[in-house]
Design a protein with these regions (language model features):
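Extended, low-polarity transmembrane helix blocks
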Residues: 1-104, 111-179
Length: 179
């Protein structure tokens, strides 16, 4: 009788493979980005210097500057007009709305609660800026494109179902839980 080597094991993408773990890491990292930028808006502090490490986040004032610039430069007149005539004049409200929306996106992604919806929310926040600045050529591989690609992936993949609350919600609601 001859011994045969065991058959190689195959892994499926749906199992807890390296891909699932990488999506989980991407979800958590992107959630931290949104959460920290939301906190920068809440506390109106964008620059941090820890001595050995310094960095900047987007405060409400910086966000208003980015939107003002994008709305002025865009070739999409209705989108620019929306920001110039509605959002920017009402920045006292919209600045806080942005902070709370980023906070919701950050918490959703970080904890994996309705993670696909959170990713779509992030796309809704960042997408218009990228679209308004598309023709300038300045932001193709910089902010906000560096946030768009991960958000697109996270809107497609159910990354919150591994090491996230979406997993428990799927167990409870089954196919009725779409995130």
């Amino acid at each position: 009788m001859t011994e045969t080597a065991p058959a190689p094991q195959t892994t499926r993408i749906g199992d807890a493979t390296i891909f699932v773990r990488l999506f989980t890491a991407l979800r958590i990292f992107t959630g931290l980005v949104f959460l920290t930028n939301a906190l920068a808006k809440v506390f109106e502090k964008g620059s941090f210097d820890l001595g050995f490490f310094s960095f900047s986040l987007i405060s409400k004032g910086s966000a208003k500057g980015i939107l003002t610039d994008a709305a002025a430069k865009t070739w999409i007149r209705p989108l620019g007009a929306f920001y110039q005539h509605l959002v920017l004049p009402g920045w006292a409200f919209w600045g806080w709305f942005l902070a709370l929306a980023e906070l919701a996106v950050g918490i959703g992604l970080l904890l994996g609660i309705a993670s696909r919806l959170a990713a779509v929310g992030g796309l809704v926040l960042i997408g218009p800026i990228w679209i308004m600045l598309w023709h300038t050529g300045l932001y193709l591989w910089e902010y906000p494109a560096e946030d768009l690609f991960p958000l697109v992936l996270l809107a497609i993949a159910p990354a919150g179902r591994h090491f996230g609350m979406d997993r428990r919600l799927v167990e409870r609601f089954g196919r009725r839980w779409p995130f």
